């Protein structure tokens, strides 16, 4: 992909882009896709990995830490949710971990477990036993979270497994490995649930996500690099793209090294969505201009929605 630049005294603008040729990340070969010419006054990179920005040679923030582990989510159906919910209430009294509510005759629930030792996890004995008997791997229990899905009364969504290796989400060979390992772990977790959880007797895997859940990959260098100090201090900005209080949520592949830190209210400036290299290029999603820890609070769906809205409003104002 080639970007045509227009020089300015302070910065540059993209005039148009077109596909020329693509390198595969494993250097096996090259191929030429169908050429597409795109001309626009503004460009928004919402690719997640900042693929558009990378292909026109934008600057990126340095990755000083390991990538957060990727996840592969799935659904199980055919579950007696009411039976499982009653059992959970008997086993777990921590309502910060397990909640079970009956709303209009339908049971809604959520529960979790991790291999971290910061809590007395009610589900820990079941995972310990399953590891000892070889039903699941030790790494399969690094992160386990389930919750009901509105309109699907016999289904639970699993926010796991979390792939335990340090893999690069920008490399095809690594994402392929993550998908393989994730699907194998899903099979093991499904057997575990059917054996140890009441209500799962007739349960089955009904869906596996088409894509990996990637928490962090490339981060564009923007006109402002948002920091964890900005976030923790609640620094105010003239042009906030969003306001949030979602915690700093940074996953790690090792035990007792993940971060889930509550925060006060904080703002993200629109300048952290603006490319340093091009005046008319924006990025939304996990690839924003923020340091590693701050990005861990801003990568979630609600914040990404707000980024898109903020950029759209900004561009609309520039065009009017």
Please state what every model-predicted region is.
Residues 3-37:
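Conserved beta-strand-loop-beta-strand element in the redox core of flavoprotein oxidoreductases
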């Amino acid at each position: 992909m080639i970007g045509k630049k227009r020089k300015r005294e302070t910065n540059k603008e993209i005039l148009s882009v077109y596909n020329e040729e693509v390198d595969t990340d494993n250097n096996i070969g090259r191929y030429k896709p169908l050429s597409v010419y795109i001309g626009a006054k503004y460009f928004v990179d919402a690719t997640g990995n900042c693929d558009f920005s990378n292909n026109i040679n934008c600057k990126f923030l340095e990755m000083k830490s390991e990538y957060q582990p990727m996840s592969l989510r799935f659904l199980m159906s055919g579950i007696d949710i009411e039976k499982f919910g009653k059992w959970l209430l008997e086993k777990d009294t921590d309502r910060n971990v397990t909640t079970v509510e009956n709303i209009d005759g339908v049971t809604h629930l959520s529960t979790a477990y991790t291999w971290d030792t910061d809590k007395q996890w009610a589900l820990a004995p079941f995972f310990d036993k399953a590891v000892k008997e070889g039903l699941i791997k030790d790494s399969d229990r690094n992160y386990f979270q389930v919750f009901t899905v509105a309109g699907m009364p016999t289904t639970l969504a699993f926010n796991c497994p979390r792939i335990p290796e340090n893999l690069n989400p920008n490399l095809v060979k690594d994402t392929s490995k993550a998908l393989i390992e994730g699907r194998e772990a899903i099979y093991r977790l499904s057997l575990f649930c059917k054996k140890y959880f009441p209500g799962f007797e007739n349960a089955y895997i009904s869906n596996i996500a088409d894509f990996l859940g990637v928490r962090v990959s490339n981060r564009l260098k923007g006109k402002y690099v948002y920091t964890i100090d900005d976030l923790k201090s609640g620094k105010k900005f003239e042009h906030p793209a969003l306001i949030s209080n979602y915690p700093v949520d940074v996953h790690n592949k090792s035990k007792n090294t993940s971060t889930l830190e509550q925060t006060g209210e904080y703002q993200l400036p629109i300048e952290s969505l603006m490319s340093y290299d091009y005046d008319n290029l924006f990025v939304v999603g996990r690839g924003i201009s923020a340091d590693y820890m701050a990005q861990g609070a801003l990568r979630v769906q609600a914040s990404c929605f707000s980024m898109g809205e903020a950029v759209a409003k900004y561009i609309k104002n520039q065009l009017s």
